[in-house]
A protein has these predicted regions:
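Accessory alpha-helical/coil subdomains and C-terminal extensions
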Residues: 144-218, 223-225, 233-238
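Short amphipathic alpha-helices in soluble, non-transmembrane regions
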Residues: 236-247
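Proline/glycine-rich low-complexity loops and linkers
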Residues: 53-56, 63, 80-175
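Glycine-rich phosphate/diphosphate-binding loop of Rossmann-like nucleotide-binding domains
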Residues: 2-45, 232-236
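Conserved hydrophobic helix-helix packing surfaces used for dimerization/oligomerization
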Residues: 8-10, 150, 274-275
Length: 275
């Protein structure tokens, strides 16, 4: 029997995201990894480095999500306010994590660019589970309060992804209500609307597994997705639908689970082997 379904909101913090100076890959990565463990992402929110607006976003998330995940704003500068604002919103004090402080001393002891404000990073919500940062200095964390599960991850994409996969996903895996498997059939020479017309009747009645066409920059894909208690069961559900899609689309199919025509051609050349 599957577990309770948890709704998640991702709050990405950073004025640079709103200005378009940085692409929000963190939200994409978090969503992708959560989908693999059956945790539903319902909302993406982006907010600048403003404590009042961030507090409003957290209050909104508290009213509609079971899991709140923030990315960004954990660094040592004056505009890194995610921990302070989030902890205040849940009435949790920030306390020094001595293990992280010791680790930070070790990390920066030979640095010429050390400043005392670096140690603000080791102030964390009391009683939280600490996520060590293997790619930087700002730790993340998770805590539970008022029936909500709160995770805070760093903003730099490399740091966020490493912490997400090594710490956050293992922490959240217990909450997933099943396993999700998704595969794509890549096609060239036929448009999204034509593919939709071919499969319209089937897609209207399919729920699990499901399929949907998507237009990409130079081609299209048909995404087939299934959810089950185990990955093996989900794979079994997806397999016949994938075969059906490939059979119906025939000569338009150039690959499965590839990113582009170029990648498919390269794989073909390597398999020959040819250059």
């Amino acid at each position: 029997m599957m577990k309770k379904s948890y709704d998640t909101e991702i709050i990405s913090v950073g004025t640079e995201l709103l200005l378009g100076h940085v692409t929000n890959t963190d939200a994409r990565d978090v969503s992708e990894q959560l989908s693999k463990i059956g945790v539903n992402v319902r909302y993406h929110t982006v907010v600048g480095d403003n404590p009042e607006r961030l507090a409003q976003c957290i209050e909104t998330a508290k009213g509609r999500a079971d899991i709140i995940i923030t990315t960004g704003g954990l660094g040592p500068t004056c505009d890194d306010l995610t921990k302070v604002v989030t902890a205040r919103a849940f009435g949790v004090p920030l306390v020094e994590d001595k293990s992280e402080t010791a680790g930070l001393y070790e990390y920066i002891k030979n640095s010429r660019h050390f400043t005392p404000n670096n140690f603000s990073q080791t102030m964390l919500p009391e009683g939280c589970t600490v996520f060590h940062n293997t790619c930087g200095t700002a730790p993340g964390c998770a805590f539970e309060k008022d029936g909500k599960i709160v995770l805070m991850l760093p903003g730099p994409p490399k740091e966020c992804y490493a912490m997400l996969t090594k710490s956050a996903i293992p922490y959240l895996r217990r909450l997933g209500d099943g396993e999700i498997v998704s595969h794509s059939v890549r096609i060239f020479g036929i448009g999204e609307s034509a593919v939709d017309a071919i499969f319209a009747e089937e897609m209207n009645v399919m729920t699990n597994p499901s399929m949907a066409p998507y237009a990409k920059e130079c081609d299209c894909l048909v995404q087939v997705t299934a959810k089950a208690e185990t990955q093996e069961e989900a794979e079994t559900m997806v397999r016949p639908v994938m075969e059906h899609v490939k059979e119906r689309l025939g000569e338009y199919v150039y690959g499965v689970d590839v990113e582009s025509v170029e990648e498919s051609v390269m794989q073909l050349l390597h398999s020959r082997p040819m250059t």
